Amino acid sequence: EVLFIDIKNTPIYWIGMFKKLIQNNHIFTSQIVGFFDKINPEIDIENLKGMGDRVSYERAYYYLSKIDITDKMHQDSISLNIDKQLLKALEQSILFFQEYEEYEKCAFIKKILDFTKTL
């Protein structure tokens, strides 16, 4: 019997996607800016960058929000993924959401960041 695991529904995947989206945010944003700048050179680039950042951080948070810090499997997944990039992504996300006064998101991310410091 073959067992299939839907990797997209695992905490290790969610943490990896969170980290990847934050790390690659600047690439995504510059691609959006480049695309729209070709269509309309008079477009407000700073506003467009802000929208690109918003899309990236919101999508990254979508994945991170699936983490249940009280679940042992989720804790183990964080332990397996912990590195400088994850810590930086968590810190950057807190700063980003503070700018928009989304303190519930900041508090959730801070719980995960605090958990990483216990490892």
Each predicted region: which residue ranges?
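Long, low-complexity, acidic Ser/Pro- and Gly-enriched intrinsically disordered regions
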Residues: 1-98, 108-119
